[in-house]
Amino acid sequence: MSFSRSEAAPAAPLPDLAATLAAPRDDAFQQLGAAFVTRLPAAPLPAPYVVGFSDDAARMLGLEPALRDAPGFAELFCGNPTRDWPQASLPYASVYSGHQFGVWAGQLGDGRALTIGELAHDGRRYELQLKGAGRTPYSRMGDGRAVLRSSIREFLCSEAMHHLGIPTTRALAVIGSDQPVVREEIETSAVVTRVAQSFVRFGHFEHFFANDRPEQLRALADHVIERFYPACRDADDPYLALLAEATRRTAELVAQWQAVGFCHGVMNTDNMSILGLTIDYGPFGFIDAFDAKHVCNHSDTQGRYAYRMQPRIAHWNCFCLAQALLPLIGLHRDAPSEDARAERAVEDAHAVLGRFPEQFGPALERAMRAKLGLALEREGDAALANQLLEIMDASHADFTLTFRHLARVSKHDARGDAPVRDLFIDRDAFDRWANLYRARLSEEARDDASRAAAMNRVNPKYVLRNHLAETAIRRAKEKDFSEVERLAAVLRRPFDEQLEHDAYAALPPDWASTLEVSCSS
């Protein structure tokens, strides 16, 4: 398989795209006003070059993949031309606040991200945002830059999560530069173009609530409802309905994270999408040797965002969103007094938040049932899945390979057990569980082959393990971007065998255990 690009690729209409982005802005979020955004050009990035590009994300935007080869592509998607755009067309950074590691952090905002415009395709509108585009009024002590290392990780994981079927922001491109930036060591700059229908976060609502700006809070909620939750308009209480939908999406999202062993790493409220998307890929990680207490973020010394904590933290974050929406809940109903409205709003919000476990639990159970190849629903299925996770935890069995190899287990006998059994230190514990599993499989009408095929459609063979990303990053630092492309291509087909790429599905090498990721990016 070749990952080189044809020199005969047709020229893409880059001037048309640049003109579209530079045209006077009509995207809805920036029209909310100066209380929400600050316009400014991107900081110049010297001698930019393309590190990675997603053909799939380009097609989603209605762009031709050949666009990446057009002269000026790297310049456009690091933001350099924005210095010449008219004031009405300038990119913008948005302001928000939030709780970080459970503590109110006050005003935050897009400290290094600029939204450069919207593109519409197939009835949807997408915002394009440049992460690493320079300082903004919300940069605090930061330099506004992103580094090559973290940009490649975000690019790869955004696309990997999409192809796993998990709601996520997307990534169109990574643009690099030799410009040095200081982190824990000297690194080089990069800009990742991320794409989403909206980058509105829980923290946007928290900001206007905390600053006692009810008009802006309502305008923001109305924008989100009108654009993304139109069904909420017809509810008895549109703002309560918004909270309910955002909470449901969040619960279902985290269930999907748990089902693939994904750890976000920094589940601050300013990193929570109002649309229920995975957003802000920083010190994330897919679990290798399973540990329910696994913490992927080296900076998270208290383990607040450990794998097992993610559902609880997501629920807590929804409480923060609910608090921010309280001034709006009940405004459409008659109430004898403001105190009565506020009291009823608290009751209604608590009722919505109380449904989170009822939404998360069944969503995770459905996912785990599918991962075990169980088409029928039985009362003991959740216990069977939990027992598997417990023995995986005790043996530190590889998360991804355990579920992938389970497809080889036969309902009739133990002859197919070896590949998954060998992942366990305590093989007697696995044998005991496997006997329970086989007994449960005997209740299913599907034969082994049909069940295995169904399991392989939900249990990925390939995930973005840290050592795979690290290998691509090390080569990219030497100006060899072929591994970024190769790895991205493999991750676009996570459920396929791709036998020529078996090495990407192997157990991590010993050196992978020394890798640490943190908030430094």
UniProtKB/Swiss-Prot annotation:
GO molecular function annotation: AMPylase activity; ATP binding; magnesium ion binding
Catalytic site positions: 270
Entry keywords, A to Z: ATP-binding, Magnesium, Manganese, Metal-binding, Nucleotide-binding, Nucleotidyltransferase, Transferase
EC number: 2.7.7.-, 2.7.7.108
Reactions catalysed according to its record: L-seryl-[protein] + ATP = 3-O-(5'-adenylyl)-L-seryl-[protein] + diphosphate; L-threonyl-[protein] + ATP = 3-O-(5'-adenylyl)-L-threonyl-[protein] + diphosphate; L-tyrosyl-[protein] + ATP = O-(5'-adenylyl)-L-tyrosyl-[protein] + diphosphate; L-histidyl-[protein] + UTP = N(tele)-(5'-uridylyl)-L-histidyl-[protein] + diphosphate
Enzyme class: transferase
UniProt signal peptide: none
Cofactor needs: Mg(2+); Mn(2+)
List of residues binding Mg(2+): 271, 280
Pfam family, one: SelO
Residues that hold ATP according to the record: 109, 111-112, 131, 143-144, 194, 201, 280
Residues annotated as transmembrane: none
Similarity comment: family membership: Belongs to the SELO family.
Function: Nucleotidyltransferase involved in the post-translational modification of proteins. It can catalyze the addition of adenosine monophosphate (AMP) or uridine monophosphate (UMP) to a protein, resulting in modifications known as AMPylation and UMPylation.
Name of the protein described by the UniProt record: Protein nucleotidyltransferase YdiU
Annotated organism of origin: Burkholderia pseudomallei (strain 1106a)
Lineage: Bacteria, Pseudomonadati, Pseudomonadota, Betaproteobacteria, Burkholderiales
